[in-house]
Amino acid sequence: MDYHGKTDNNIAIKTRKKKLNNNINKKRTNEMKKLLTLAVMMLTTSGMMAQTETKAEKKDSVNPNKPVFTVIKENPITSIKNQARSGTCWNYSTLSFFEAEILKKTKKTYDLCEMFVCNKNYMDRAIVKVRMHGDAQFSQGGAAYDVLYVLKNYGICPEEAMSAPGTMYGDTLNNFNEFFAVMEPYVDAVAKSSARTISTTWRNGLQGILDAYLGKCPETFKYEGKTYTPQQFASSLGLNWDDYVTITSYTHHPFYTQFAVEVQDNWRQPGSWNLPMDEMAAIIDNAVMNGYTVAWGGDVSESGFTREGLALLIDEKGTQSLEGSDMAKWLKLTPKQKQDKLKEAGVTVKELTPSQEQRQKEYDNWTLTDDHGMLIYGIAKDQTGREYYMVKNSWGETGEYKGIWYMSKNFIIAKTMDYMVNKNAIPKEIRKKLGI
């Protein structure tokens, strides 16, 4: 009996303790729930505020002057390439031009080999320098005609048929720093030799350097199951190499005649048709609107050409301050500051109107130079109605428009050194004047 009584008391005590503990636990649980609910509410509110602030920041950060482009005409082109650390824009832009020509005519897409062209062209250029006893320039640069000459005389191969060797320093991009540091002194040593006669053995040595750094040009190769020589492959592309002409516009030679544009990289000295500026411009418009592209060579050293994919013929004297602040006088800004100001000003930037007289003045005083080669393939306009050429670059998928530049018509007309185009893209009335 006593045993059972003690047990009942113990049970009663345990029951009361259990109830007390349960009540305490319930209170703790409720308090925890309240705290968790409050924390969630605070986090949600904080998140909403952060989103609101982010949206506001984004809204504030949008530049109302940023160009918004509407395409007027866009012709098919091949993929964006990267010339990297090599002075081969002339090569990339012109091969890109011929790839677009093939695409237009045959609907086939090709990736033609730039280093095949370099290999052949640098050997030819070295031979000329030696023949001139060193009184000729030997450099990485070139002209659109160099590519056409190689296609006509040596042929071409697709990129896959000529693998690049050790020149790339472990990656897939061109790096001509070491290459030319080796090759230029070699060519100079032969060209400026004091010997009465020289042998042709030096060509074998130079060819070894070219092959080591650029890759060896194949004598034959297979492409899509068929064996070709480079000449046979070039013939199979469906183009007539005699269809291509070069156009320029200067007053120190008669209009509607040909002359070799006097720049150092035009070392083969081909003739370019000299036209009045307005007709030079009309050919570009006519070409693009009729499905053709244009291999353009010109000056991109101006502050109106940005690395973000925009080029405008800015009025530097008239644009003293793009913000209206006396602190930022345009002519005193650094190149980087000018680029930033241009980006900020966008479509509000005032442009100059190009003229024949200004083109000639800048050519004669070295302001207009042959800096770069690119491919014009389309026409677009911004929200103000200003028209631009759509231009493919060879600096990889860089800038605001992933390797494409929007270059105002005024900029292109003013800064053109010369360009290559299919003669069938020239308006009939101009062709008649040229007799082609």
Specify the residue positions occupied by each region the protein language model found.
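Bacterial Sec-dependent N-terminal signal peptides
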Residues: 1-16, 20-53
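Active-site nucleophile-adjacent alpha helix/oxyanion-hole segment immediately C-terminal to the catalytic cysteine
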Residues: 64-238, 242-253, 259-266, 271-294, ...
